[in-house]
Amino acid sequence: MLSHRNILSNVAAALEVVSLHPGDVLISVLPLSHMFERTCGYYVPLKAGVPVAYTRSINQLAEDLAFLKPTVMVAVPRVFQRFLARVEQALAASPLKRALFSLTVALGWRKFEGRAGKVEQSLFRLLQPRVAGPVLNRLGGRLRLAVVGGAPLELRVARSFIGLGLSMLQGYGLTEASPVVAGNREHDNDPVSVGAPLPGVAVRVNEAGELLVRGPSVMLGYWHSPQATAAVLDAEGWLNTGDLAEIRAGKIIIKGRTKDILVLSNGEKVSPQDAEMALLDDPLFEQVMLVGEGRAYLVLLAVTQESDERTLIKHAKARLKSFSRWVRVRRVIALREPWTLAEGLLTTTLKVKRNAVYDKYRERIESVYRNGIRTV
């Protein structure tokens, strides 16, 4: 149960973090049944006096962006992942264009980090209108701010858009907190993190590594379910989020979901989210999910156009080399058909429904484990 006070406190706090201007136009992409969109894509612009334009459907988003020319977009990472994939696909045929795109992103990223010298800044100013301009024009040509939440943002995606000159801010929240808990600021943006807590929101990490939240936006409780409420909300008002996290220099870094932890047959625990994010940094992988609960090793389910398992294992190994030795992919199940919302394999914010995906491919997973490890 979210009260008017819960929601309005969240709206007021969000507007202290993100600036909306009188000339802005916000495009709404996500379902209004989701609290992220309801607060950030509806109540926040309403409070700021900013008009909201609604896309007809995700499949018509490109046309709507060109027509509406929004300045602000609130979306889940998957929207930008798809957009970037299309850009990279278009560049694949021209090594020169691909090289110029990569150079522009690299220079823009160095500028964002404050590490660009005078020559690099001059070169970026030269390349940006010629390389970044045409790409950002596909987003309508006026987009100045992208607020991303609802699922983890890949660093590769953030780096690409920020490098092109778009301000992309990752935030974090959950429905039980109305929903925004934290967010990066335009003047203090660290895409590795989800930013600092909103004004008035307190956070801490308990002994189990789980993020706890307290503040005026935290729910009253679950409807007619005192037992479920007591399980996540203590007498002091601390809400158990179910997310594993670290707090570094005041910023929150989400490490995964407590319920998603995979316990291997040797008792070692693996948080799949960080590993999956690292894998998605490789353009070869479109969608991924690690499995291995109660098993001796991990198997990767990957939506990809590559069919050679040895190639896929090598790419996975390269992306996971900095992880512990237990986070190693020994087999890959290559899948051509993407996981979709219509099929019931994604949430409304386009996060993978792990149980649903596992159930769909259960027989193939069992078969792979029966056949054992493949030597690369």
Language-model segments: which ranges?
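Conserved AMP-binding/adenylation subdomain of ANL enzymes
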Residues: 8-25, 32-132
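Gly/Ser/Thr-rich phosphate-binding loop
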Residues: 71-74, 86-189, 202, 286
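Residue-level signal for inorganic ion chemistry
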Residues: 73, 150, 203, 250, ...
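Adenylate-forming
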Residues: 218, 251-280, 307, 325-328, ...
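C-terminal boundary motif of the adenylate-forming
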Residues: 244, 281-307
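Conserved C-terminal "lid"/linker of ANL adenylate-forming enzymes
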Residues: 287-289, 320-376
